[in-house]
Curated annotation (Swiss-Prot):
It comes from the Eukaryota. It comes from Malus domestica. GO terms for cellular component: apoplast. Belongs to the glycosyl hydrolase 35 family. Involved in cell wall degradation. Degrades polysaccharides containing beta-(1-->4)-linked galactans, acting as an exo-(1-->4)-beta-D-galactanase. Glycans are attached at N459. This is Beta-galactosidase. It catalyses: Hydrolysis of terminal non-reducing beta-D-galactose residues in beta-D-galactosides. The active site is at E182, E251. Its main location: secreted. It holds the Pfam family Glyco_hydro_35.
């Protein structure tokens, strides 16, 4: 190619790129989001990048695309990206730019929910814990320290996206951004400061000039030009606060979260499809499945408190990235049917006619197109309806879609996809376990602090660990009557949560724990004390920090008292104001026993002398990765409570000892769904299997470390492959 021609080609290419970026635009009217001048029905799904591994991302995105999605929606997780003030992290599972670019490579759009409050059953709602200790701070209100920190992080994310040219107006995939998150109920509770904060947040976000619309979910008074959107199991009755804004549903709840101690929620595919079709027929044009792939709360990222390590959410793609049938396929077919109506849906508003006492037709008819949705809202009875000269059979609680106003191509209750059954197949058991017992900490050790009275746990640990020791000495005189009459004194402890192990003179006296509904707990038990000095050691254990509510700066955990000892010669002692010695974390954590190098720093016991069913015990074993690429999990059904690591990476908290309470029974797709309906695994562990990402393994010599708080039988831990088997018949 000649120099002149090459120069001309370069100029043309440059102008082409400039024109392409300049012509890219995102706007909206009352019908839809408008991308580059085209009104779109947009189907989205939530995939949270830190809840899977970078190696999983391409397959998850591809399966989302194959499932008929146009958009991937994700939160931005502030505490993962700014673990300490001004120190940012965007690597590995937190490589946000890489994730967005992978979405772009598949030709999908992105809805970036910057927040930076996320809720999401994520630790502290996504806020970094250091934020709680900024002087004068009050969270999510008209408070200058909070607004300054929030604006700084939001600007950081927007600047990164702009630098990588990731907004649609730059030729990138981001078509929408979200500021704040479900703030409406909080604003209603706190009043004027909340309203001022909402106005400030909207103005701040719009001022960042991203070139794409901003949204606020569950925010009825979202200031213009911000679009208010709906979250919920159903959103057909939602209307945006201005007639010129589109009807958007940012969270179609495909299931519900699992909490330790709770049954496992499911939501029938038919009802999810029904809710979506009902939203579309009522004029909705953007919907997002929360979650499309839930993933895993690796490490200590689970919030709640008491959120399980699994964030499966009964999503169309399960925790391991496998399609959940029939939900994935049934929704794929729904999306195809909706897309076949797109031209009519974005052109006109529907006309609604009654077809029966509990049946309706929603018809979108323009000069060139006609699409109809025939709905049966009856939860018990099928009906035959007449429409446009034809007869249509509508099962209970269902909607049929007719892209040409004549031909039914889809009904939400008629499932064409095959159902699948989960299979967990053992591939490795009989690990060569070794044990190391974590001895009870004493007050005279190093790295301890002695203070007058009881102190809040997170204030001391700064959430660097789940564990905080509270220690004091109880001196018993030789003349105490209980030493002779055998009536042991009653020790009573009140804690803000979340779990507590009580040790006296190195021996476990009892364990208590709370729940998501009531994280506070109390211990009250007659205890064995001897004449002289008795060592009382309380191991307070957090199980994730709350992710929703008001006044985050006031939340607490740990032993706040009172602590009393009743049944002494002098009556009852109030020990709350005594001198207490504090130690953050465990010895094993400080030694790094979960790492290859740290695990060699102590003497481990193996064989017949190995500890079993002992509290505060570390276990380690090595194993080779099984062949193949099937997803892997650990079956922890024989263990109590603790944490798991693979090659130094934290799988998360295990707690199979917390048995699911509640009621499980028959599940009908028909009728209004809520999170108490269609629950499973009552009377079983809330979570038995724990996801082990393939990418964390090497072919040989993988280090598996388990810390067990209660005591368990590690010999029964096994590595399993997760797979699915399709039912022979269609539903």
């Amino acid at each position: 190619m000649g120099v002149g021609i090459q120069t001309m080609w370069s100029i043309l290419l440059l102008f082409s790129c400039i024109f392409s970026a300049a012509s890219a635009s995102v706007s909206y009217d009352h019908k839809a989001i408008i991308i580059n001048g085209q009104k779109r029905i947009l189907i989205s799904g939530s995939i949270h990048y830190p809840r899977s591994t970078p190696e999983m991302w391409p397959d998850l995105i591809q399966k989302a695309k194959d499932g008929g999605l146009d958009v991937i929606q994700t939160y931005v997780f502030w505490n993962g990206h700014e673990p300490s003030p001004g120190n940012y992290y965007f690597e590995e599972r937190y490589d946000l730019v890489k994730f967005i670019k992978l979405v772009q490579q598949e030709g999908l759009f992105v809805n970036l929910r910057i927040g930076p409050y996320v809720c999401a059953e994520w630790n502290f709602g996504g806020f970094p814990v250091w934020l709680k200790y900024v002087p004068g701070i009050a969270f999510r209100t008209d408070n200058e320290p909070f607004k300054a920190a929030m604006q700084k992080f939001t600007e950081k994310i927007v600047s990164m996206m702009k630098a990588e040219k990731l907004f649609q107006t730059q030729g990138g995939p981001i078509i929408l951004s979200q500021i704040e998150n479900e703030f409406g109920p909080v604003e209603w509770e706190i009043g004027a400061p909340g309203k001022a904060y909402t106005k400030w947040a909207a103005q701040m976000a719009v001022g960042l000039d991203t070139g794409v619309p901003w949204i606020m979910c569950k925010q009825e008074d979202a200031p213009d030009p911000v679009i208010d959107t709906c979250n919920g199991f159903y959103c057909e009755n939602f209307k945006p606060n201005k007639d010129y804004k589109p009807k958007m549903w940012t969270e179609v709840w495909t299931g519900w979260y699992t909490e330790f101690g709770g049954a496992v929620p499911t939501r029938p595919a038919e009802d999810v499809a029904f809710s979506v079709a009902r939203f579309i027929q009522s004029g909705g044009s953007f919907l997002n499945y929360y979650m499309y792939h839930g993933g895993t709360n690796f490490g200590r990222t689970a919030g709640g408190p008491f959120m399980a390590t699994s964030y499966d959410y009964d999503a169309p793609l399960d925790e391991y990235g496998l399609p959940r049938e029939p939900k994935w396929g049934h929704l794929r077919d729904l999306h195809k049917a909706i897309k076949s109506c797109e031209s009519a849906l974005v052109s006109v508003d529907p006309s609604v006619t009654k077809l029966g006492s509990n049946q309706e037709a929603h018809v979108f008819k323009s000069e060139s197109d006609c699409a109809a949705f025939l709905a049966n809202y009856d939860a018990k009875y099928s009906v035959k309806v007449s429409f446009g000269g034809g007869q249509y059979d509508l099962p209970p609680w269902s909607i049929s879609i007719l892209p040409d106003c004549k031909t039914e191509v889809y009904n939400t209750a008629k499932v064409g996809s095959q159902s699948s059954q989960v299979q967990m197949t053992p591939v490795h058991s009989g690990f060569p376990w070794q044990s190391f017992i974590e001895e009870t900490t004493s007050s005279d050790e190093t790295d301890t602090t002695t203070l007058d009275g009881l102190y809040e746990q997170i204030n001391i640990t700064r959430d660097t660990t789940d564990y905080l020791w509270y220690m004091t000495d109880i001196t018993i005189g030789s003349d105490e009557a209980f030493l002779k009459n055998g009536k042991s004194p009653l020790l009573t402890i009140f804690s803000a949560g979340h779990a507590l192990n009580v040790f006296i003179n190195g021996q476990l006296s009892g364990t208590v724990y709370g729940s998501l509904e009531n994280p506070k707990l109390s211990f009250s038990q007659n205890v064995n004390l001897r004449s002289g000095i008795n060592k009382l050691a309380l191991l307070s254990i957090s199980v994730g920090l709350p992710n929703v509510g008001t006044h985050f700066e006031t939340w607490n955990a740990g032993v706040l008292g009172p602590i009393t000892l009743k049944g002494l010669n002098s009556g009852t002692w109030d020990m709350s104001g005594w001198k207490w010695t504090y130690k953050t974390g465990l010895k094993g954590e400080a030694l790094g026993l979960h790492t290859v190098t740290g695990s060699s720093s102590v003497e481990w016991v193996e064989g017949p002398s190995m500890a079993e069913k002992q509290p505060l015990t570390w276990y380690k074993a090595t194993f080779n990765a099984p062949p193949g690429d099937a997803p892997l999990a650990l079956d922890m059904g024989s263990m109590g409570k603790g944490q798991i690591w693979i090659n130094g990476q934290s799988v998360g908290r295990h707690w199979p000892g917390y048995i699911a309470r509640g009621s499980c029974g028959d599940c009908s797709y028909a009728g209004t769904y809520d999170d108490k309906k269609c629950r499973t695994h009552c009377g079983e562990p809330s979570q038995r299997w724990y996801h082990i990402p393939r990418s964390w393994l090497t072919p040989t010599g993988n280090l598996l470390v388990v810390f067990e708080e209660w005591g368990g039988d590690p010999s029964r831990i096994s590595l399993v492959e997760r797979g699915t088997a399709l039912d022979a018949k269609k539903l």
